[in-house]
């Protein structure tokens, strides 16, 4: 075997020689020099020594000490500061594996001992019961001696308190063992032992129970008989006279899917839907996530989405309406009384500038059109006029395209529509729209052909154009009266009123003046001094000052009523328009008004409508976002013009919102970030500042606080009183945001007839100009067989060895193309220019 010295061994184990000699001395080996030989036995002895030393170190519990120091500064009076240093120290000791193993063994021994004791007690209890059954068996088998058994068994029961007192310790273990034995037998229902006195009493009652079971044997799962229940009363103690109840579990797992009836209202949350289907909300959320709709448990779903989910999960859906409150309100508003004839409500409709308001002016003998900005109507005006033939209520609607919703409301609230058509202008887009609104509302038409005093008036042309849209004059065999009028001269106005009142007689309009007032909102605005003001048209009943009214989602008590001339009135009957003050907000035009006797009822219905409107709006907005998720992916690239819009009345605000949101295209859009009725306030200015928006005031002005913020922050605020102007300005702003298009104009085309070589420019094309003019230093394209093969710049242009700025059609020239020498005979050189063109919507 190879001899190994201390030095070689130190080199093998990668340890200094001095360190190895020291370890060998500690191991009791005689080596003192590096050249001494180490045998295998000595190596083994050294290895054993090193292992034992390492094991001792390992067995020592390892400690980890954590120290933390935090320094803070405490300020005291007099601008002084005190440095506070907090030191914390924690020591963690790791337990050895031997300790952990010993503890585990100890726990197992204790558990095994407990189980053995329990098993031994169970065996003793079973043995004791077997002995009791053996003792009771002869008593049941001998009927002659049976009467003596109850007496013998009853005596210990009466002496139970005295007998149980000396040995309570022996009674408790038997009760515990019996309880464990009952738990091991699941097929026998357990009795309610909460009122039991202990095992001793049960043991004394055992013979009595055995005799009862012998008298009425029954299977364990069968219901208990009357005798069994009567004998199950506890005897003695607190439980005297109480019947023992069986605690058998009645739940059975369903073998198939459970189909439930799910009632879904207009809105429902995910949690409510899952509760009705008896499934976890997480399952519904997971199902909707698979459908591509991420929701939360409190997400409000609209009726259609909830119906789809419930039906997909296999349940029956019943769509219900959450209008119990509305139904009770409708029942309370029913009124029976004597009906009388009422005045007709007539709406004047037609295209803009066709003379609607001027015609009403002549009828009212008042100059209303002069007071409208720009001479066009921008509000719904309501007036009632006393004529020789009776009273007529007129509604004047705007004719501009932006006021479509106003015209639709006017048609719904009216009995007869006067369609004004200019004789010199003919049928226009808003004229056709007015006809459609009247037909949709089922309202009869009377056509007033205005401006017949102008040259070029053609009545037959208007009859022909209107007949295309289903309006046929009486002269042509239809049922629509046509009346020629002149609002300026007053011609034909009496005949027009005659036709209107004739239509009203045919309709037989009735109303009940003694009923509570009911009507519709024509217009609403926010007055700085008087608060919300609503113009309402009373359709039935009588509206009185002091009435509690419910208008849409607003309510209030009428503090004052004004007629169309601004004069206060105490009451208003059917077909009378009035302004009412006292509402808690500005209602939307078209909202229904009802008089209620109870303020509490009005408040309850108003709050219900507000919450319902908010829930439906949120549900629809969320559904819209999910449906258009892919369409909206590119919306972030759109340029947006933010606008804060304030108007004098609610109808104009709605019309402006619709008109402005309709502007824009795929690259630019308008977003009305805020709006309302009333003047521009400080909060509106702050909203415009935060959203980088433009402030627009339509027939309103800004207060001092808003003007101060606008001046300090340099906001853009503009006032308007004509709807044309605001729409035109927004169009110009959007056009500026579009930028410009680059358009190419072809200036000239030259054909290559020959190719020359120049030491300075390379290949020179001898060309004939075919079309237009060829200019130097302009971009060109080289076409070969009408295919673009090069695009560059025209570097050299000569005519008879002289440089030329341009060469016209029909002349020859030499053309040098920059950085291109592959010119061939027959190629065409196209000279063009790029022009920036402003874009428009």
Swiss-Prot record:
Residues 350-357 are annotated as: G1. HAMAP family: IF_2_B (MF_00100_B). This is Translation initiation factor IF-2. The keyword Protein biosynthesis applies. SUPFAM superfamilies: Initiation factor IF2/eIF5b, domain 3 (SSF52156), P-loop containing nucleoside triphosphate hydrolases (SSF52540), Putative DNA-binding domain (SSF46955), Translation proteins (SSF50447). InterPro entries: DNA-bd_dom_put_sf, EF-G-like_DII, IF2_assoc_dom_bac, IF2_II, IF2_N, P-loop_NTPase, Small_GTP-bd, T_Tr_GTP-bd_dom. Residues 375-379 are annotated as: G2.
């Amino acid at each position: 075997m190879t001899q190994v010295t201390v030095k070689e061994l130190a080199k093998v184990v990668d340890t200094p020689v001095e360190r190895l000699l020291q370890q060998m001395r500690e191991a009791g080996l005689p080596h003192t020099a590096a050249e001494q030989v180490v045998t295998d036995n000595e190596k083994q002895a050294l290895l054993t020594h090193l292992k034992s030393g390492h094991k001792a170190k390992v067995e020592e519990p390892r400690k980890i000490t954590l120290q933390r120091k935090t320094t803070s500064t405490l300020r005291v009076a007099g601008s002084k500061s005190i440095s506070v240093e907090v030191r914390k120290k924690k020591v963690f000791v790791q337990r050895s594996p031997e300790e952990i193993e010993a503890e585990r063994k100890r726990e197992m021994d204790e558990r095994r001992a407990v189980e053995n004791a329990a098993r031994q007690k169970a065996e003793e209890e079973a043995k004791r019961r077997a002995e009791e059954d053996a003792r009771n068996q002869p008593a049941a088998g001998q009927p002659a001696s049976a009467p003596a058994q109850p007496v013998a068994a009853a005596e210990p029961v009466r002496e139970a308190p005295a007998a149980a007192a000396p040995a309570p310790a022996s009674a408790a273990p038997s009760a515990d063992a019996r309880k464990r034995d009952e738990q091991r037998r699941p097929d026998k229902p357990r009795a309610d032992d909460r009122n039991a006195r202990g095992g001793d009493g049960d043991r004394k009652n055992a013979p009595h129970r055995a005799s009862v079971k012998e008298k009425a044997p029954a299977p364990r799962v069968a219901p208990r008989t009357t005798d069994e229940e009567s004998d199950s009363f506890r005897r003695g103690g607190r439980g005297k006279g109480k019947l023992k109840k069986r605690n058998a579990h009645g739940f059975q797992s369903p073998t198939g899917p459970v189909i439930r009836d799910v009632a879904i209202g207009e809105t429902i949350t995910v949690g409510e839907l899952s509760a009705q289907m008896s499934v976890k909300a997480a399952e519904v959320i997971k199902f909707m996530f698979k459908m591509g709709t991420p929701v939360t448990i409190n997400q409000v779903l609209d009726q259609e989405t909830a119906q789809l989910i419930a039906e997909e999960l296999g349940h029956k859906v019943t769509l219900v309406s959450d209008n119990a409150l509305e139904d009770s309100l409708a029942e309370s508003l029913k009124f029976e009384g004597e009906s009388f004839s009422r005045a007709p409500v007539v709406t004047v409709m037609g295209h803009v500038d066709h003379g609607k308001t001027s015609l009403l002016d002549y009828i009212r003998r008042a100059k209303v059109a002069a007071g409208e900005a720009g001479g066009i109507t921008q509000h719904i005006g309501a007036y009632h006029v006393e004529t020789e033939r009776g009273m007529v209520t007129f509604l004047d609607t705007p004719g501009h395209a932006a006021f479509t919703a106003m015209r639709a409301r006017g048609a719904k609230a009216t009995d007869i529509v006067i369609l004004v058509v200019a004789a010199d202008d003919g049928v226009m887009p808003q004229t056709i729209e007015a006809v459609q609104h009247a037909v949709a509302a089922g309202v009869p038409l009377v056509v007033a052909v205005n401006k017949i005093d102008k040259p070029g008036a053609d009545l037959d042309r208007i009859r022909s154009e209107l007949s295309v849209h289903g309006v046929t004059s009486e002269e042509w065999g239809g049922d629509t009266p046509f009346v020629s009028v002149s609002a300026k001269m007053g011609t034909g106005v009496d005949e027009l009123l005659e036709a209107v009142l004739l239509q009203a007689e045919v309709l037989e309009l009735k109303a009940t003046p003694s009923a509570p007032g009911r009507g519709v909102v024509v217009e609403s605005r926010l007055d700085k001094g008087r608060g919300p003001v609503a113009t309402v048209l009373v359709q039935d009943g009588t509206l009185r000052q002091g009435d509690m009214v419910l208008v849409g989602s607003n309510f209030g008590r009428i503090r004052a009523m004004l007629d169309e001339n601004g004069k206060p009135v105490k009451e208003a009957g059917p077909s009378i328009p009035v302004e009412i003050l006292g509402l808690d907000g500005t209602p939307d035009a078209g909202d229904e008004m009802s008089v209620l006797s109870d303020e509490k009822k009005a408040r309850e219905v108003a709050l219900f409508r507000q919450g319902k409107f908010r829930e439906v709006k949120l549900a629809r907005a969320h559904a819209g976002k999910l449906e258009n998720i892919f369409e909206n992916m590119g919306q972030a690239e759109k340029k947006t013009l933010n606008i804060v819009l304030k108007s004098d009345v609610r109808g104009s605000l709605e019309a402006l919102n619709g008109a402005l949101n309709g502007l824009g295209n795929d690259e630019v859009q308008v977003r009305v970030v805020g709006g309302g009725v009333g003047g521009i306030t400080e909060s509106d200015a702050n909203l415009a500042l935060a959203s980088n928006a433009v402030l627009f005031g339509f027939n309103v002005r800004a207060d001092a606080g808003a003007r101060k913020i606008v001046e300090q922050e340099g906001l853009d605020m503009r006032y308007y009183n004509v709807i044309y102007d605001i729409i035109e300005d927004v169009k110009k702003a959007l056009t500026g945001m579009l930028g410009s298009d680059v358009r190419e104009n072809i200036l000239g085309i030259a054909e290559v007839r020959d190719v020359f070589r120049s030491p300075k420019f390379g290949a020179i094309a001898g060309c004939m100009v075919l079309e237009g003019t060829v200019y130097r230093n302009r971009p060109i394209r080289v076409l070969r067989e009408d295919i673009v093969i090069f695009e560059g710049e025209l570097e050299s242009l000569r005519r008879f060895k002289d440089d030329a700025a341009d060469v016209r059609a029909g002349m020859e020239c030499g053309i040098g193309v920059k950085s291109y020498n592959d010119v061939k005979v027959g190629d065409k050189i196209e000279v063009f220019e790029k022009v920036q063109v402003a874009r428009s919507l």
